[in-house]
């Protein structure tokens, strides 16, 4: 996948996507209506829209005239998620893409079978360097173990490999780059880095500025391998990731790709506050993505297979 082309906003959608299927949960906040509607109008993708029939018809006024779309009625958010997961299970060998509003993420994470863990990744391109940085966190797990953080990094690594062949530099974030018993997240970051597989260069704990600012690394005379050029950022907690995400999105005006996978099936999610560009980028990335090997599998073995 040519991510640089994608972020430079070539014509989207980029293909007709014949034989592809999009299964999307639609609700009142209309978070993902724009990209779903655009792909339905401009490609030959088939779609299953899950939710209240009345709400779907109000958001897609000509839905009854579209032959490539079916509506699956649901009675609640949880019911919608369960039906989406059933589609992911039965259509896993086909070109299937899933989509949900951000408001359904916590329900999705809670509804996943025990053998899966949940990893959401946001991909940003930094304006000065024009390179991609992946941001991930443990979401509902507010006290992630080092093993959990290492597993998040591995899942993010598999997404990174969709558009890059290089060995990614992974930073386990904390308040500073020195491990201390007084700051628990520094110890977790250190242990997570030690557990990480050899297919990435991992360091932790690492402060945010050392992870992304070469100038800060020079000023602080940091001697590590990651000197402002991290490819993957693993946040210690959900609050940290959320603060970074909204700072980049709202104050730096960046347009994130929001992606996860249910087994091998890509899922993009949208927030009502996301820009139309962000929503299109997320949809195109998901539709054109195909990972090798299971993603999100709850495997605590952190050695290279």
Feature locations, PLM:
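Anion-binding alpha/beta catalytic cores of soluble intermediary-metabolism enzymes, centered on
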Residues: 2-226, 230-305
